[in-house]
From Swiss-Prot:
It comes from the Eukaryota. The lineage of its organism: Eukaryota, Viridiplantae, Streptophyta, Embryophyta, Tracheophyta. CDD domains: F-box_AtFBW1-like. This is Putative F-box/kelch-repeat protein At3g22730. Kelch repeats lie at residues 155-204, 245-293, 324-372. SUPFAM superfamilies: F-box domain, Galactose oxidase, central domain. Residues 1-50 form the F-box domain. It comes from Arabidopsis thaliana. Keywords: Kelch repeat, Repeat.
């Protein structure tokens, strides 16, 4: 039996179980299928039913680059593929330099080097440029409100109106896609310093490392896009949140990398568990980094494979010659340093490594909504 002999409902049911990257390749093969892939009803069904194909992306030299990590014990390695090019808005067509990026449900929220922001679906090649009152000390997060209609995507803007890069945040705004406008969040105040510039998106909310303004202890700060409020959560015992980094494991758990200080070669990996609606931390594994000398690399972005007990980490170092990716595993089963080959100009920004799951989520004028 040919696909053309099947009913449209059955074809839709079959295709809704195909990953987004495969559907992208099918768009040009059939006009009917291409129209189906643009149908919001099909997009919602496919998002919920299709298996999630995770890609590793790295923000490198102002571009988002796919990265393949070979985690074999005998010869671990890293391979970079061609960059995913973000184009300027029409009628311009030049590539845009990306300064920061965060992601949620296959959408990337990017800040450009000229202080513009754009929501980008690399799988579909769609973009939505967002107008905002520019302030270079703003930070952004992408998440979604959960209600009976599904997921309604929003952008949070945190702004230090004193124009000081101290992490002190005073004002908060929400961007709504449906109205293409920003609104101020009233009665929202923080009594902590946000330590990590880029938040981690997890199940629609955004998480940052932070420290209490008065007592200086470390904490996990969560912004709930449904209630539009901040919540404090606990962290594992540690000396300094500036020596920590956050990540997500398989879309199911938060992960924390903890280093005690710049001279310690001991690195701990923690993961979250939810027990009776309370977030709890458990230690996953510990690594004694086999590095020579007194200085241990400051690892600011990473991905972890819980099954293999291995992490792929990036060190924050603005000296071009010292930029490296590390593959580090439990009991020193893995250890590889991979220098990054970059151009001659100095790279300033917030390099990150993250898991990205391509999706058909559309950036619509009426707002981005996924029905649960």
């Amino acid at each position: 039996m040919m696909m053309s002999d099947l009913s449209l409902d059955l074809v839709e049911e079959i295709l809704s179980r195909v990953p987004a990257t495969s559907l992208k390749r099918l768009r040009s093969t059939c006009k009917l299928w291409n129209a189906l892939f643009k149908n919001p009803g099909f997009t919602k069904k496919q998002f919920l039913k299709a298996p999630k194909e995770s890609l590793v992306l790295m923000l490198k030299e102002y571009s988002v680059c796919p990265m393949i990590a070979n985690l074999s014990v005998s010869a671990p390695s890293i391979e970079f593929k061609g960059a995913l090019n973000l184009k300027n808005y029409p009628p311009y067509s030049e590539e845009v330099d990306i300064h920061e990026a965060c992601h949620c449900d296959g959408l990337l929220l990017c800040t450009t080097m000229d202080y513009r922001i754009v929501v980008w679906n690399p799988c579909l090649g769609e973009t939505r440029w967002i107008r905002w009152p520019k302030n270079i000390y703003s930070r952004f997060a992408l998440g979604y409100e959960k209600n009976k209609y599904g997921r309604i995507y929003k952008i949070l803007r945190c702004w230090d109106r004193h124009n000081s890069p101290t992490g002190r945040v005073d004002e908060f705004e929400i961007y709504e896609f449906s109205s293409d406008s920003w609104r101020v969040l009233d009665l929202v105040a923080l009594d902590c310093h946000i330590a990590s510039h880029i938040g981690v998106s997890f199940k629609g909310n955004t998480y940052w490392l932070a420290s209490d303004k008065k007592d200086k202890y470390g904490l996990l700060l969560c912004f709930d896009f449904t209630t539009e409020r901040f919540t404090r959560l606990c962290l594992p015992p540690s000396q300094d949140v500036s020596k920590m980094a956050l990540s997500v494991v398989g879309g199911k758990q938060l992960s924390l990398l903890s280093q005690s200080d710049s001279t310690s070669k001991i690195m701990e990996m923690w993961v979250t568990n939810i027990i009776e609606d309370v977030l709890m931390w458990s230690k996953s594994f510990t690594v004694d980094i086999p590095i020579r000398g007194d200085y241990c690399p400051y690892l600011t972005s990473y991905l972890v494979d819980e099954e293999k007990k291995v992490a792929v980490c990036y060190n924050e170092n603005f000296e071009k010659s010292n930029k490296k990716v590390y593959i580090i595993g439990e009991d020193n089963g893995y250890y590889t340093e991979i220098p990054l080959v970059e151009s001659s100009y100095q790279v300033w920004g917030y390099p990150i490594i993250f898991n990205y799951v391509p999706s058909l989520v559309q950036i619509e004028e009426g707002g981005c909504i996924i029905k649960e």
